[in-house]
Amino acid sequence: RIAPKGFKPDVPSLDLKSVDGSLNALKSPNPAVRYLGFQALKNFGDSALLKVEELLQDKNSYLAARAIWLLPHLGENGKKKTVTLLRSKNRDQRLVAYRSLRRTGENMVTHARALSKDTDAGIRRDVAISLRFLSFDQSKDAFLEIAKQFDGQDKNYVEAIGLGAHGKESQVWEHLKNKLGFQKSPMWTNAFARITWRLGTNKAIPYLKERVQNTEFSIEQRKFAIESIAFINHPDAPDALLELGNTIQEEELNDVIVEWMVRQGLTDWG
């Protein structure tokens, strides 16, 4: 590290036997010292709570965030304080509080449902990813709220929904389709079409075929439906594209079908 000539660093002594000393260690820029402070404060438990809560008010948001990561480890009162931060006016505090509760193994069903309605898209994305570790029954309400607020443009948002739905894609897609009133493909919004593309369930194939064949949709929308079928890793997908290739009249769409048949035949379907 570059330093002025004659510079002598003043390294503070490490005191992990007191709450104040451990708190100073937690504030350290050195990750190893910070870890020691974190562990020491964990061991102090409820007796360190007041001092850690004071750190929440620090003007340095990074130091305040360290307090949130620690709070759920300080007994039931610390966990309750963390839960209250899920309703903070500060979006960063809400996000870190949600993540810190997850890390402690807290049952996140109720918290996920609450924050699935959050006004901040970044927080909803985080909630969506966390649903990966919940069952369909536990997560379906949160998925519905998150899907309702998708603008159809945010690629990270739709990817978060896909990651969260891993292993239960068909159930999530059917639930969203029915609850959002998209039982017929002409009713679909572009947002739901993109969610369908990401979830990649074979349950969507008949609806996607209908979109490809329906001339009321734009060429781009029909191409996107072809692409959505192509990304479905199920035996019904190549059969559907083959059938469409034999019935679609537009050369532009047929070229897209052939391109995807070749590409996927050499990779996912090969």
Q: How would you name each of these model-derived features?
A:
Residues I2-G270:
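Long, ordered, helix-rich scaffold segments
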